């Protein structure tokens, strides 16, 4: 029991800065929306549409680079810090390489908006935002590379501090470029893209300054030796990171596709769906942070050749995450009307949102299990298991169930948005079950198999 308490303490210390950094990231999006809305509804809508194109694109790059965290954690646990610079420098090369196709996708924004039949004025503002923010792609991915270094070494506070500096800088920079203050041009919603690009470059440079000057990282000697790009290392990193990137893509696109399928059901349904989704996304940051911390702890323990420690870290992560999920689920049910009132005063929307928030409360528990189990499996570098199981859960089980219940009369009368939320529960519960079973299978193997599995 003492080991479990000690592990829980270590986990919470790691997860708290990750959570706060996520809040800062969300805060930047909130500031963009509010300040663009101060210009016009069209500017605010343009920023929202641009975010729906920008975020899935950049998330794919983040997913690829997330593979570096367990790599660094395992090397750190094994006392092989001298090998860390090679991995991070290869990661930086990967970040620059994948910036090219991501920018290429962002360049196609005009075609995407044309396909969506977006209003011409809104489309122009959206394209302007994307063309500005695409300059942030290399900086954002290089920042993630360096964050993989600090997180992998169990130093999660630097990214938290720099994330809040970024948020604080984003406010005056938005004020300058959105409203045309201090000699800057008044760009409206496009100015949010300019501010975001500047902020991400500053955040990258600040983290670079930290990793090169911190006494805590003196032994790593990140840039003392230059390691040229190696094709084998790039292929290995891509193979390790691609399943994580794809799994993130499956999850993001699941919610995006459901939003499109709900759209024809009317503005009231769409508004209620958006209230429930937005609140769920905020709550999800809590188990997501615990999952990230679990990945670090499991990787570190495996580096120390302690399969028992890795098993305890996995169990503690799931227990802590499930406990917090039960608490937030109860609060969601009890306060569902007050939650809906934070978003709107339309009683029809509030009534429907309250129903959807009950579904959201149900899936918070299984969502916590699946994201933390996935974090533990990342610690084992079992990326393909995450890829396979999330694809089956989200796209072969969750989405079809939601579609059948929401829009057809094959089983029951069309349930509308409620049907899709039942689909979410089916998908996330299936993911939790399959990832949990996989993790349990790993834990049942003997030490030699587990350590060889980790080292493959």
Swiss-Prot record:
It is a multi-pass membrane protein. One of its GO terms (molecular function) is antiporter activity. Pfam families: MatE (PF01554). The keyword Ion transport applies. The keyword Cell inner membrane applies. Keywords: Antiport, Cell inner membrane, Cell membrane, Ion transport, Membrane, Sodium, Sodium transport, Transmembrane, Transmembrane helix, Transport. GO terms for cellular component: plasma membrane. It is found in: Cell inner membrane. GO terms for biological process: sodium ion transport. Its main location: membrane. The chain crosses the membrane at residues 11-31, 53-73, 93-113, 126-146, 159-179, 189-209, 242-262, 276-296, 315-335, 356-376, 391-411, 417-437. Belongs to the multi antimicrobial extrusion (MATE) (TC 2.A.66.1) family. NCBIfam families: matE. Multidrug efflux pump that functions as a Na(+)/drug antiporter. This is Multidrug resistance protein NorM. It comes from Vibrio vulnificus (strain YJ016). The lineage of its organism: Bacteria, Pseudomonadati, Pseudomonadota, Gammaproteobacteria, Vibrionales.
């Amino acid at each position: 029991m003492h080991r479990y308490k000690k592990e829980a303490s270590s986990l919470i210390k790691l997860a708290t800065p990750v959570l706060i950094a996520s809040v800062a990231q969300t805060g930047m999006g909130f500031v963009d929306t509010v300040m663009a809305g101060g210009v016009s509804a069209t500017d605010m809508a343009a920023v929202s549409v641009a975010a729906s194109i920008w975020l899935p694109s950049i998330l794919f790059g983040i997913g690829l680079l997330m593979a570096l965290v367990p790599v660094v954690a395992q090397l750190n646990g094994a006392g092989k810090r001298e090998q860390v610079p090679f991995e991070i420098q290869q990661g930086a090369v990967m970040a620059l390489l994948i910036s090219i196709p991501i920018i290429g996708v962002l360049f196609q924004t005009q075609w995407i908006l044309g396909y969506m039949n977006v209003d011409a004025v809104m489309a122009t503002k959206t394209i302007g935002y994307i063309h500005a923010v695409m300059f942030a792609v290399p900086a954002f991915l290089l920042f993630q590379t360096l964050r993989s270094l600090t997180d992998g070494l169990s130093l999660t506070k630097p990214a938290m501090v720099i994330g809040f500096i970024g948020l604080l800088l984003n406010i005056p920079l938005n004020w300058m470029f959105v409203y045309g203050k201090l000699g800057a041009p008044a760009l409206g919603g496009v100015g949010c893209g300019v501010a975001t690009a500047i902020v991400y470059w500053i955040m990258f440079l600040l983290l670079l300054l930290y990793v090169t000057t911190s006494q805590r990282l003196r032994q790593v000697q990140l840039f003392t030796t230059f390691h040229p790009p190696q094709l084998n290392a790039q292929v290995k990193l891509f193979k390790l990171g691609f399943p994580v990137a794809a799994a993130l893509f499956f999850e993001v696109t699941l919610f995006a596709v459901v939003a499109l399928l709900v759209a024809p059901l009317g503005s009231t349904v769409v508004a209620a769906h958006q209230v429930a989704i937005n609140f769920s996304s905020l709550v999800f940051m809590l188990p997501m942070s615990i999952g990230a911390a679990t990945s670090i702890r499991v990787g570190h323990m495996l580096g120390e050749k302690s399969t028992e420690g890795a098993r305890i870290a996995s169990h503690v992560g799931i227990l802590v995450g499930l406990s917090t999920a039960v608490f937030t689920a109860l609060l969601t049910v009890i306060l569902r009307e007050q939650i809906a009132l934070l978003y709107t005063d339309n009683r029809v929307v509030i009534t429907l949102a309250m129903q959807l928030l009950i579904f959201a409360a149900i899936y918070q528990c299984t969502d916590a299990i699946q994201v933390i189990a996935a974090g533990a499996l990342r610690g084992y570098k079992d990326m393909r298991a995450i890829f396979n199981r999330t694809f089956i859960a989200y796209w072969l089980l969750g989405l079809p169930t939601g579609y059948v219940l929401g829009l057809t009369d094959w089983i029951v009368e069309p349930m509308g948005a409620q049907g899709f939320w039942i689909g979410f529960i089916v998908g996330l519960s299936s993911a939790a079950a399959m990832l949990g079973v996989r993790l349990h299978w790993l834990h049942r193997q003997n030490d030699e198999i587990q350590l060889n599995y980790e080292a493959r």
